[in-house]
């Protein structure tokens, strides 16, 4: 009877240890986004709703599942447990199929997702002219974004701020003369609105997510191969 290849066994262990670390990283990052002050300010208002956190909550679940699978894979490899390896294989295969399905749905409903982003941004415009405490947190987050990207307002420029425009002395102040400016209520403000910068920001991050997902899919396929080879070798001992 053939023995278990030490190379396959320890390659499987190393792979799953790295996989487990990836799970910790994803989980930690998602939790940080979920509880950070900036994300609370942007997504935490009642007007925006809790649906904005769905993607973050999914990442928390994915990170936890990857940690569990990494643990199963490590223990299965070291203990040469066919049961653990089979559970690892099934779990990893389900995650891979879910990633493929998500990618297909994302491509099919891309236009719809773009429309949802537009509607959300337009809906959030009214928060800039509101006076409540929860809206104030959102406003402060947008002010930081405006200063970084040298833009003003979300859709209609400085007019989006309504009466709040007078409450923030340096709001939208056009300090970079290389950027287009315009006069509003006796002040020179940035002419460009922030909606295009936000869309570009989301698009760039989406490309990063797609790249990470593709790399993760390759790693997952290797994990499936390693686990099945080791599973068969243990059965043939």
From Swiss-Prot:
Q: Could you tell me one molecular function GO term of this UniProt entry?
A: integrin binding
The record, for Pfam families, names: Tetraspanin
Its gene name is: TSPAN8
Q: What is the lineage of its organism?
A: Eukaryota, Metazoa, Chordata, Craniata, Vertebrata
The entry's protein name is Tetraspanin-8
Q: Which GO terms describe its biological process?
A: negative regulation of blood coagulation; regulation of gene expression; spermatogenesis
Keyword annotations? Cell membrane, Glycoprotein, Membrane, Transmembrane, Transmembrane helix
Assembly, in brief, is: Forms homooligomers. Interacts with MEP1B. Interacts with integrin alpha3/ITGA3. Interacts with RICTOR and MTOR. Interacts with ADAM17. Interacts with ECE1.
Q: What's the source species for this entry?
A: Homo sapiens (Human)
Its topology with respect to the membrane? Multi-pass membrane protein
